[in-house]
């Protein structure tokens, strides 16, 4: 299974006073460089989601895609942009893994863990969890669900996947958290 690594850098960084969090320095290296270093060995291709002028990321030599739904905001807009990009590449990339660019210490085996959790649970979607908290920004997303996600965002105005406030039932039961694994499941007969 080929996976595209989606680096989410589309936010406005309000809590950090604005600017690009991904370009903030940590020990002489940008957060983005650190995340790329961790994720690149785990995926077959890398893609950066960022809004505004993409030339500010030129030195990273990555495709840069803006949010698919302009003005929507939030990480789901970036995930949808990644799903759209992967779909445009053809059937070679059936999954994307999304990661935040302000998390420079992501696990070296994140993609393997997400893939294993997804397969073991028979789920469509998987996301990371730690310390009893689910982190949906770090997720494994099948490209085939992109239109379901688009409809949920546009028609139902879903802006986040918030497992704390909305689990176990997200969007009328479309998602449910597997009891013993950090996995969200989507049943084929249900909407997004």
PLM regions: where:
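Nucleotide and nucleotide-moiety/phosphate-recognizing core
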Residues: 1-158, 166-179, 183
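Acidic, Mg2+-coordinating catalytic module of metal-dependent nucleases/exonucleases
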Residues: 189-192
């Amino acid at each position: 299974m080929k996976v595209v690594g989606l680096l989410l850098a589309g936010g406005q960084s309000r809590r950090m006073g604005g600017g690009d969090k991904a370009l903030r320095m940590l020990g002489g290296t940008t957060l983005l460089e650190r995340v790329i270093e961790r994720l690149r060995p785990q995926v077959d291709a890398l893609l950066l989601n960022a809004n505004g002028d993409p030339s500010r990321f030129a030195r990273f030599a990555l495709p840069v895609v803006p949010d698919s739904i302009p003005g929507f905001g939030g990480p789901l807009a970036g995930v949808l942009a990644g799903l759209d990009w992967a779909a445009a590449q053809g059937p070679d990339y059936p999954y994307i893994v999304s990661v935040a660019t302000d998390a420079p210490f992501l696990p070296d085996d994140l993609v393997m863990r997400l893939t294993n959790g997804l397969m073991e649970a028979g789920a469509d979607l998987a996301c990371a969890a730690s310390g009893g908290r689910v982190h949906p920004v770090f997720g494994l997303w099948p490209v085939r669900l992109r239109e379901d996600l688009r409809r949920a965002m546009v028609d139902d105005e879903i802006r986040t996947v918030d497992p704390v406030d909305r689990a176990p039932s997200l969007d009328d039961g479309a998602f449910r958290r597997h009891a013993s694994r950090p996995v969200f499941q989507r049943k084929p007969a249900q909407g997004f």
